[in-house]
C-alpha cells in the first residue's frame, strides 16, 4: 500500500490541476459566472480500488473548489468497454462543457469522441488515452518510464536464467501496453 500512496496523491493533484486548467480553458472572460459542466467517465467506480477512488475524489474536490458541476458516470467493471461507451454516448447527449475520460480501450471509443468534438465538447484524457489524438488535454503518468524503472530494478534482482511472467490488467489499454514496453526496456537483454 505504501508504494501506491505516492501514486494516488500524485494522481489526485493531477486531477485538481486538470480541473483548474479546464476552468481556465472554458472561461472566455474573467468575469464569467456560468458554472462549467463536467462529466467524468473513469474505467470503474469501486470503493475497494484505492487508485480510482482517489482519482474520483480528486476530481470532486477540484470541481468543488472551482465551482464546477461534476457528474461521475462509471462502468461496473474496468474491462466493460461496451458499458463505458454507452456512458460516453449518454454524456455526449447531455452536452457538457467537457468530458473527462479514462478509456478502457485504445480504439473502441474514437467514433464517439469524434462526435463529442464535433459538438464542441472538450475532451480530457485521464490516466490513459486512445490511438487517435482527440483530446484537448491529457493528465497521465509516463507509463513507459515507470515500467522502465521497475524493469531496471527487477534486473538487479534476477540473473539470465530467471523466468519472468508479465501479467497485465486490461488487455489493450494504453497504460498496460506502455508499462510492459518500459518494463521490457528496463530488463534489457534479460527480457
Can you name each region flagged by the protein language model?
Residues 89-92, 98-117, 183:
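Hydrophobic alpha-helical
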Residues 71-93:
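Structural motif
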Residues 25-55, 65, 72, 136-137, ...:
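Short beta-strand segments enriched in small/hydrophobic residues
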Residues 9-24:
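Hydrophobic membrane-insertion alpha-helices, especially the h-region
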Residues 106-145, 163:
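Flexible loop/hinge segments that line or gate small-molecule binding clefts
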Residues 150-190:
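An alpha-beta-alpha
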Residues 49-60, 81, 85, 110, ...:
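Short, surface-exposed alpha-helical segments at coil->helix boundaries
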Residues 92-103, 122-126, 165-166:
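Periplasmic-binding protein-like
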Amino acid at each position: 500500500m505504501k508504494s501506491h500512496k505516492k501514486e494516488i496523491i500524485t494522481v489526485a493533484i493531477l486531477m485538481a490541476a486538470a480541473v483548474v486548467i479546464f476552468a481556465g480553458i472554458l472561461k472566455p472572460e474573467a468575469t464569467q459566472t456560468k458554472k462549467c459542466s463536467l462529466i467524468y467517465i473513469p474505467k470503474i467506480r469501486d470503493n475497494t480500488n484505492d487508485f480510482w477512488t482517489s482519482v474520483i475524489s480528486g476530481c470532486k474536490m477540484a470541481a468543488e473548489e472551482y465551482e464546477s458541476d461534476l457528474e461521475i458516470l462509471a462502468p461496473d467493471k474496468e474491462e466493460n468497454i461496451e458499458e463505458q461507451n454507452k456512458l460516453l454516448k449518454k454524456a455526449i447527449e447531455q452536452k457538457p462543457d467537457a468530458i473527462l475520460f479514462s478509456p478502457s480501450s485504445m480504439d473502441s471509443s474514437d467514433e464517439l469522441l469524434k462526435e463529442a468534438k464535433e459538438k464542441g465538447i472538450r475532451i480530457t484524457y485521464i490516466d490513459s488515452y486512445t490511438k487517435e489524438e482527440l483530446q484537448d488535454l491529457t493528465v497521465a503518468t509516463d507509463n513507459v518510464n515507470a515500467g522502465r524503472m521497475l524493469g531496471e530494478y527487477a534486473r538487479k534482482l534476477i540473473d539470465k536464467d530467471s523466468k519472468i511472467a508479465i501479467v497485465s490488467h486490461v488487455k489493450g489499454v494504453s497504460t498496460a501496453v506502455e508499462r510492459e514496453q518500459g518494463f521490457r526496456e528496463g530488463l534489457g537483454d534479460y527480457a
